[in-house]
């Protein structure tokens, strides 16, 4: 059964929904386009909650009727049938109660944003760089399945096809809401191609996921920037440029340095570098502002040490384990090709469960 506090909030939302429905039929509202659109937007935000709450109340009534039937029905077969139905209703109620609580949680304002992902080789030398390349391909595969666009900002490739570092943008609806859980240290256990004795090695790569920020989200004073240009290779590191198209931007107050050289023109490189700088500055200011909160998302890059990990990719056993939710899949190849939803869906659920738990702990402490 939902707590009184939750029921009161749901009834308040339902009442507001009915008010909006009524207002939208009034001539003075219809003729005021700005007010009309504002009400439509407000209605859309709460519509799912109202529908779920209506379904919840319907299930409560069904449960009540079935409880009476299980107590008063004389026919044994009908009573058994009612008991079985009651069991199903209880399961549905449990699920819908969780959904309603989750819908009442505050939304992450960055969930619908595009993202900037940074992958860096950690412990393990060349093998770590190869693993960083595997992770990059995994995220490209996932983005393709979602119909999202991937654009490389900068990369530092190695001779064997790995990456010491690669930074890229993922553009698509809800990209941050799905991929923010990838932040942290990823660990691989396998026999490296450079290993002649066939011994299994452990290497790491770190992943950071930053929401892409608009200029209005992060204010940058041009006087705080030192912008340098340098000669660079062209796209993918080919063709030496005779012009200085590479761009390095230093944000002097924070010490953050961003550089981009993958595009042919200085203007394009500067534009991409500014995107990364805005995202890093947003994360920097957030961390400063909420320094006391040791949240996973704000400690993204990590040190790359073997002990600090969120997920392990074990090649000999074809197993991928996410240590935050203690979940393993034995579909290693599929995961590395971009089949990540089985992990992401569980991580979203775990996050909601944790948020609900904290919310009601706080409510209990103040009531």
From Swiss-Prot:
The keyword Transcription does not apply. It holds the Pfam family RF-1. The keyword Protein biosynthesis applies. It is found in: Cytoplasm. Its main location: cytoplasm. GO terms for cellular component: cytoplasm. Methylated by PrmC. Methylation increases the termination efficiency of RF1. GO terms for molecular function: translation release factor activity, codon specific. Signal peptide: none annotated. The modification N5-methylglutamine is found at residue 238. Keywords: Cytoplasm, Methylation, Protein biosynthesis. SMART domains: PCRF. It comes from the Bacteria. Belongs to the prokaryotic/mitochondrial release factor family. Peptide chain release factor 1 directs the termination of translation in response to the peptide chain termination codons UAG and UAA. This is Peptide chain release factor 1.
